[in-house]
């Protein structure tokens, strides 16, 4: 957001190639409520999107830029990658197989849709004090 406001590029450390799993806060809230009400096992359960939904960090950066551009307008936000910085671990996959056993039909919000909703919320709440600066 600050890069967009100040006309600077959005710099990402590393190549952007590592994969990560992202869960929309509303989806996580629904799963946490389900866990509190219905999950009775002593063994933990992982509340995560599936491995097939892993997203490269570069896609995250481009999705943020795209959503900011769509909601603010102006000069498109340039995304750059500082490959002098380490990528870190390539994958940090959490297995949601157990969750799928209990909730096979749970629909996770698609990543780009969740990102757009999140950016819109951020922009609506930034100046009102709903977001820490």
Question: What is the predicted role of each segment?
Answer:
Residues 2-133:
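C-terminal substrate-binding subdomain of Rossmann-fold SDR/epimerase-dehydratase oxidoreductases
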């Amino acid at each position: 957001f600050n890069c967009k406001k100040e006309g600077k590029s959005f710099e990402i450390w590393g190549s952007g190639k590592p994969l990560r799993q992202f869960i929309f806060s509303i989806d996580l809230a629904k799963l946490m409520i389900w866990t509190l009400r219905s999950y009775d096992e002593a063994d933990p359960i992982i509340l995560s999107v599936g491995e097939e939904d892993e997203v490269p960090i570069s896609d995250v950066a481009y999705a943020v830029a795209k959503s900011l551009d769509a909601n603010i307008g102006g000069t498109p936000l340039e995304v750059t990658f500082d490959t002098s910085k380490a990528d870190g671990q390539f994958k940090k996959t959490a297995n949601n197989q157990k969750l799928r056993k209990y909730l096979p039909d749970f629909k996770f919000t698609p990543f780009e849709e969740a990102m757009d909703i999140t950016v819109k919320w951020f922009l609506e709440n930034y100046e009102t004090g709903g977001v820490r600066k």
